Amino acid sequence: MFGSSEIVTKHCVSEIFHAVIILLVVVACGAYMSFLERRLLALFQNRYGPNRVGWHGSLQLCADLIKVMFKEDWIPPFSDRIVFVLAPVIAFISSLMSILIIPFTPTWIIWDCNIGILFFLMMSGLTVYSVLLAGWASNNKYALIGAVRAAAQTLSYEVFLGLSIMGVVAKSGSFNLKIIVEDQLYLWNVIPQFVGFITFFLAGMALCHRHPFDQPESEQELADGYHIEYSGIKFSLFFISGYINMIVIASFIVTLFFGGWQGPWFPPMILFITKTFLLLIVFILIRAALPRPRYDQVMLIGWKICLPMTLFNLLSTAVVILL
């Protein structure tokens, strides 16, 4: 009896250790993505970028952290104080929650959830509340317009995100991400589900508010949108949560369409990290290469292009499975 309790205790400690390590690494990577993006954009635009702190600017994150810590943590007197403080915390926590169900390797997974896809869709929908609360609590017209834009964009593209995943779910027969990865042992889903991959990629960028879908934060129109009244640590929480969302979307693309940890020659964790890193590079290069469309064009892309594509993909997948 005591032996079994010791085994359970050791297993719980091991699982908690894995969870803490994964979450800390993801937060650190989310913070470091700012430096990586600035360096890559500088390389793309034929300039130097941040290169003064550390070797080739590698310690720029430390300099940014010191700057943020010593900034005034100001709360506007005309804002709703409780909601204003709560919004970035909700954004940060909701961005981390989706990490719980991602299978990095066959053994490195925090929560092996049988309804992992539904949990991911629920967490992605939760981010709308943080944005709306931030825009409303700021009591600023630009923040409110940005929040309304973000809510409409997120709710619209969540439809296409969910429909693009349904083809993969129908093919593998499960909502469990680990089973979906194991189903891609001989053929990655990106080949039979290429249309679903394209729509998931576009919808994922829209949910992250990544360029060219960053209308809620467009500096030229809204002076940074719902971020406008935030500074210091609270702004950093929004900033890091945006990059964590980008890492989450890249990880889900790898899991759903590129075989997850599976591949030749290298250990599973190295393969997963490499695939995710390459997708993050693609996200950054898209920001460097493409202009920002108008807000009405963003909604048109969703409802008139992505929606028919996802419905066609789901229908064709169902026909192939039935035949």
Curated annotation (Swiss-Prot):
It catalyses: a quinone + NADH + 5 H(+)(in) = a quinol + NAD(+) + 4 H(+)(out). NDH-1 is composed of 13 different subunits. Subunits NuoA, H, J, K, L, M, N constitute the membrane sector of the complex. Keywords: Cell inner membrane, Cell membrane, Membrane, NAD, Quinone, Translocase, Transmembrane, Transmembrane helix, Ubiquinone. The lineage of its organism: Bacteria, Pseudomonadati, Pseudomonadota, Gammaproteobacteria, Enterobacterales. One of its GO terms (molecular function) is quinone binding. It is found in: Cell inner membrane. GO terms for cellular component: plasma membrane. Belongs to the complex I subunit 1 family. GO terms for biological process: aerobic respiration. The gene is nuoH. Its EC number is 7.1.1.-. The chain crosses the membrane at residues 16-36, 82-102, 115-135, 150-170, 187-207, 238-258, 266-286, 303-323. This is NADH-quinone oxidoreductase subunit H. NCBIfam families: PRK06076.1-1, PRK06076.1-2. It is a multi-pass membrane protein. NDH-1 shuttles electrons from NADH, via FMN and iron-sulfur (Fe-S) centers, to quinones in the respiratory chain. The immediate electron acceptor for the enzyme in this species is believed to be ubiquinone. Couples the redox reaction to proton translocation (for every two electrons transferred, four hydrogen ions are translocated across the cytoplasmic membrane), and thus conserves the redox energy in a proton gradient. This subunit may bind ubiquinone.
